[in-house]
Design a protein with these regions (language model features):
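Active-site and donor-binding regions of nucleotide-sugar-utilizing enzymes
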Residues: 3-156, 168-177
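Conserved catalytic-core segment of nucleotide-activated headgroup transferases in glycan assembly
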Residues: 148-235
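Generic start-of-chain signal for non-secretory N-termini
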Residues: 1-10, 215-222
């Protein structure tokens, strides 16, 4: 029997965004001899005293997560950090507003999406340079040609049901979201969480909301134009 190299813990924050890619990663890691555990981030917090020391891939480096990370390190875990939202950046201060140098210093290794992501973090936090490793993200790996078989059955079912169609992927989370008890609006939510701690960040946040509002109007207009111009096509 092949001896397991070590344990890897993969907390999941947003199921639809992360689950398939984490399953894919787990299969690859298991083949290499690792024992992998996938679960909700909140459940890892709940059972942190029961999991054996291993490689914990953290999703959060904010102040609210400091104590959790410190307890894991004290228990013998090696802490890695992956930022699910680090791929797209129009302003490095705004993109990385959700965590601080203090939080990132708690990490043993910080995974980055690529050179741009790594260089931005070096510019913001020069002391972290040796911790940064370019690894990409399994969410991209499962989209590559070699991995499309991962979705083969699901693709077949969708095509059989809908036929040929154009898939228009959108993201209007700043203005078109479901209101919850703890989320009134995008700006207030970020302000309350302490992410907008400078006037510059507040202004960028307001501008990004305005930008999305304009794009949302353009999106609606595009749908109308598409339907009028290509009546026989599905969107």
């Amino acid at each position: 029997m092949k001896k397991m190299k070590s344990k890897i813990y993969l907390p999941i924050e947003v199921k639809r965004r992360e689950l398939y890619s984490r399953i894919y990663f787990s299969i690859k890691a298991s083949i290499q001899g690792y024992s992998v555990t996938i679960g909700r981030k909140s459940r890892f917090h709940e059972f942190e005293k029961k999991i054996q020391p291993g490689n914990y891939i953290s999703k959060s480096a904010g102040t609210q997560n400091f104590d959790h990370i410190k307890r894991l390190k004290k228990a013998g875990h090696k802490i890695f950090f992956i930022d699910e939202e680090g791929l797209m950046s129009f302003n490095k201060e705004f993109t990385h507003r959700r965590f601080s140098e203090e939080g990132l210093q708690l990490m043993d290794v910080i995974f980055t999406w690529g050179n741009n992501h790594k260089n931005e973090l070096i510019e913001l936090y020069p002391s972290l340079k040796e911790k940064l490793k370019i690894v990409g993200n399994p969410r991209v790996d499962i989209l590559k040609d070699i991995s499309k078989q991962f979705y083969a059955e699901e693709i077949k079912k969708i095509k059989n049901y809908y036929g040929d169609f154009f898939l228009l992927v959108t993201k209007f989370g700043k203005i078109n979201f479901v209101k919850r008890k703890n989320i009134i609006d995008y700006y207030t939510s970020h302000l309350t969480k302490g992410y907008l701690n400078t006037e510059k960040l507040k202004e960028i946040c307001k501008r990004s909301i305005k930008h999305e509002e304009k794009n949302f109007v353009n999106f609606i207009n595009f749908i109308k134009l598409f339907n009028a111009s290509l009546e026989n096509k599905k969107l």
